[in-house]
Curated annotation (Swiss-Prot):
Belongs to the DXR family. Pathway: Isoprenoid biosynthesis; isopentenyl diphosphate biosynthesis via DXP pathway; isopentenyl diphosphate from 1-deoxy-D-xylulose 5-phosphate: step 1/6. This is 1-deoxy-D-xylulose 5-phosphate reductoisomerase. The gene is dxr. 1-deoxy-D-xylulose 5-phosphate binds at K128, S154, E155, S184, H207, S220, N225, K226, E229. InterPro entries: DXP_reductoisomerase, DXP_reductoisomerase_C, DXP_reductoisomerase_N, DXPR_C, DXPR_C_sf, NAD(P)-bd_dom_sf. It comes from Nitrosospira multiformis (strain ATCC 25196 / NCIMB 11849 / C 71). Pfam families: DXP_redisom_C, DXP_reductoisom, DXPR_C. It comes from the Bacteria. One of its GO terms (biological process) is isopentenyl diphosphate biosynthetic process, methylerythritol 4-phosphate pathway involved in terpenoid biosynthetic process. Its cofactor is Mg(2+); Mn(2+).
Length: 395
């Protein structure tokens, strides 16, 4: 008999959340949705409530929650509507929930992800900011509360699959020489450097291989996404910066690789579809159907690899710099990047100002020691304030 997993999906209306529900719908005998959460996407979460009938639906925005409550009653659903950060933490730590998909984008996802880990849940981690901003604190919470952590980012999931199942945090003990973290290079990999000043949000969001949300698409275009993933890999796999090498692989077929001391390189391949890593984590240690098309190696035909261009992608350099600095530096990097990307998407500054803002904010704030989650959030707040001041000066 299959044990039913009871799920809270944090960020159910985003691309990861939607893909998660697609996989869940294929296995009604395996999964029961207890709670869904979103920022303020009333119509999307209403449609999801109609289909999955969760016990709770949480919106961060109060006015949106009031609108959803009206629609839920009109639809005759028993779903209870909640709002606010405290409610996100509540549904992430419900006693009868065993699995939490942490898919809220950005720093907003940190507190509910911590709540899930603190109550010993099986945490499916798609919110990379939790690891970037508070990696040491979060991993300590996971260990102290015997939570299970399964990575959802395609690259980290690929690394997880390429490591021995008995891996417990010591790469050298299992014979690993290094992690090869693949990157597509985004839509501007071959664009003349002089042309980057004038690229539009629409161009930056047009990823050549993946279908993603706007923020992560811009991060891919700047390669900040890969920089954040380097920091995440450092904490997930206890890898030193020297053990993590970024490899540009334009086809996005190899999702990452692990090189062993005997010269063997193990890789995870597949079509670029987030349902694959999501299903791997949902079903782990079993394999479950995803709806993803089989990989046609004859159609792929070739696989290319390049070294990253740090002149073209200064955000990648800044991420390595933040990792080396430690302390509050990764949180400052992340916060400044969130403000910069949001400003670019609103056409308030050019694409090339994204790394410029981040670097200036990192220099302005400097590095501070981090001991608690409150320290992390304080650094986040200072960085956002400095980024807004930078933006005001730009105008």
């Amino acid at each position: 008999m299959i044990a039913v997993r009871h799920l809270t999906i944090l960020g159910s209306t985003g691309s990861i959340g939607v893909s998660t529900l697609d996989v869940v719908a294929r296995h009604p005998d395996r999964f029961r949705v207890v709670a869904l959460t979103a920022n303020k996407s009333v119509q999307k979460i209403l449609e999801q409530c109609r289909r999955f009938e969760p016990r709770y639906a949480v919106l961060l925005d109060e006015a949106s929650a009031e609108l959803l409550q009206v629609e839920i009653r009109r639809a005759g659903l028993a779903t209870e509507v909640l709002w606010g950060v405290d409610s996100l933490e509540k549904v992430a730590s419900l006693p009868d929930v065993d699995t939490v998909m942490a898919a809220i984008v950005g720093a907003a996802g940190i507190r509910p992800t911590f709540a899930a880990a603190a109550t010993g849940k099986r945490v499916l981690l798609a919110n990379k900011e939790t690891m970037v901003m508070a990696g040491r604190i979060f991993t300590d919470v996971v260990k102290e509360n015997h939570a299970t952590l399964l990575p959802i980012d395609s690259e980290h999931n690929a690394i997880f699959q390429s490591l021995p199942q008995h891996f417990s945090g010591d790469l050298r003990a299992v014979g690993v020489r290094r992690i090869l973290l693949t990157a597509s290079g985004g839509p501007f990999r071959q664009m003349p450097l002089a042309a980057l000043e004038n690229v539009t949000p629409g161009q930056a969001c047009a990823h050549p291989n993946w279908v993603m949300g706007q923020k992560i698409s811009v991060d891919s275009a700047t390669m900040m996404n890969k920089g954040l993933e380097v920091i995440e890999a450092h904490w997930l796999f206890e890898a030193s910066p020297e053990q993590i090498e970024v490899v540009v692989h334009p086809q996005s077929i190899i999702h990452s690789m692990v090189e062993y001391v005997d010269g063997s390189v193990l890789a995870q391949l597949g079509n670029p579809d987030m349902r694959t890593p999501i299903a791997h984590a949902l079903g782990f240690p079993e394999r479950i159907e995803t709806g993803v098309n089989p990989l046609d190696m004859f159609k792929v035909a070739r696989l290319d690899f390049e070294a990253p261009d740090f002149e073209r992608f200064p955000c990648l350099r800044l991420a390595y710099q933040a990792l080396a600095s430690g302390g509050s530096a990764p949180a400052v990097l992340n916060a400044a990047n969130e403000v910069a990307v949001d400003s670019f998407l609103k056409c308030l500054m050019p694409f090339t100002s994204i790394p410029a803002m981040i670097e200036d904010v990192m220099q302005t704030i400097g590095r501070r020691d981090i001991a608690t989650l409150d320290d992390v959030l304080a650094a986040d707040g200072m960085a956002r304030e400095a980024a807004q001041e930078w933006l005001t000066c730009l105008a």
